[in-house]
């Protein structure tokens, strides 16, 4: 059976600014209350999901675009609850499968095939599990992934007609020479032209244990540079690490341990990082899905509107091949 949890917008405190400096609405919680729905493969829905799912959706009446989210290496999909809630509160339905739970993870090919099964389930299976009067626009779906899930998101975009792809510190292996299979970074250019946003981290390439969690040669820069046919944006969260988009204390013990001790983390609160990532995702999709470009273009023009420091912000418009670069000192 599906389980639902309600979440309502937090009440604001009059006269107390949420941020120390000016910001944009996308970096704060949106206008919609949200519902979190959990679905197991044993669900009586027809067809049942091929993998356990978390769905976070606006609770109000409306038609909303869909984001398929793919979790990071051996992490629980429950570990991203703050980001899911923020994005859904701005009018998106987030569908997050638990592709696997094992350490070490399965082969990247098996992970890709599992993600493909969920993508194929969406048109037939998603709508019947949503609240009454909440409609999913499955004709316009974005795929988004973190870490190794970012690699899977890009690989899936080479196979299916998604509306956009988003990589959150995507990783394609432990080094340039030990990539995952399928090795999509072996391509000089990805064979798609859909809009792309890639958000990297400044500390992802810094080793804490044996190796860095997002090593140079297999990280966000490599993915961005291969999107040669797409309108594409690139952001780097300078002072944050690979796991800093997760909840503060993931409920899953394994995810908690990986989050705290496996990767180099930033020294500041994770909340501004999560709000920054969520806000960029919302602004990007509002631009390319809804035609509302104001917030996204404002972030590109002046990254200081973000709640954290962003370096080397770059945007390339495929229609004109013009490049806008903003290096924040």
Curated annotation (Swiss-Prot):
Give the location in the cell. Answer: Plastid, Chloroplast
Look at the named UniProt entry and state the broad enzyme category this protein falls under.
hydrolase
**Matching InterPro entries, A to Z?**
AB_hydrolase_fold (IPR029058), Chlorophyllase (IPR048264), Chlorophyllase-like (IPR017395)
Cellular component (GO) terms are:
chloroplast
Query: What superkingdom does the record give?
Result: Eukaryota
Tell me its EC number(s), please. Answer: 3.1.1.14
Q: Where is the active site?
A: 147, 169, 242
Tell me the protein family, please: Belongs to the AB hydrolase superfamily. Lipase family.
List the protein's name: Chlorophyllase-1, chloroplastic
Q: What organism, scientifically named, is this protein from?
A: Citrus unshiu
């Amino acid at each position: 059976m599906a389980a639902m949890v309600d979440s309502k917008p937090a009440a604001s405190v009059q006269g107390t600014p949420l941020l120390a400096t000016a910001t944009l609405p996308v970096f704060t919680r949106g206008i919609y209350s949200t519902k979190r729905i959990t679905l197991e493969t044993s669900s009586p829905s027809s067809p049942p999901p091929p993998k356990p799912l978390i769905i976070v959706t606006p609770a109000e009446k409306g038609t909303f675009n869909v984001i398929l989210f793919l979790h990071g290496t051996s992490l629980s999909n429950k570990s991203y609850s703050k980001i899911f809630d923020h994005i859904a509160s701005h009018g998106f339905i987030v569908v997050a499968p638990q592709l696997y739970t094992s350490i070490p993870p399965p082969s990247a090919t098996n992970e890709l095939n599992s993600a493909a099964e969920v993508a194929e389930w969406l048109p037939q299976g998603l709508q019947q599990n949503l609240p009454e009067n909440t409609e999913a626009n499955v004709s316009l779906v974005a795929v988004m992934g973190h870490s190794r899930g970012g690699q899977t998101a890009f690989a899936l975009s080479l196979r299916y007609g998604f509306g956009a792809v988003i990589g959150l510190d995507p990783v394609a292996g432990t080094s340039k020479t030990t990539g995952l299979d399928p090795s999509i970074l072996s391509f000089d250019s990805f064979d798609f032209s859909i809009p792309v946003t890639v958000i990297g981290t400044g500390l992802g390439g810094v080793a804490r244990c044996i190796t860095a969690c997002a090593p140079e040669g297999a990280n966000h820069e490599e993915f961005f540079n291969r999107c040669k046919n797409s309108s594409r944006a690139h952001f780097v969260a300078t002072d944050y690490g690979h796991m800093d988009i997760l909840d503060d204390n993931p409920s899953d013990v394994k995810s908690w341990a990986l989050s705290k001790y496996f990767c180099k983390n930033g020294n500041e609160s994770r909340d501004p990082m999560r709000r920054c990532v969520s806000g960029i995702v919302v602004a990007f999709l509002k631009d390319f899905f809804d035609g509302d470009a104001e917030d996204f273009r404002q972030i590109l023009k002046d990254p200081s509107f973000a709640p954290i420091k962003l370096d080397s912000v770059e945007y390339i418009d495929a229609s004109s091949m013009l490049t806008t670069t903003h290096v924040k000192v």
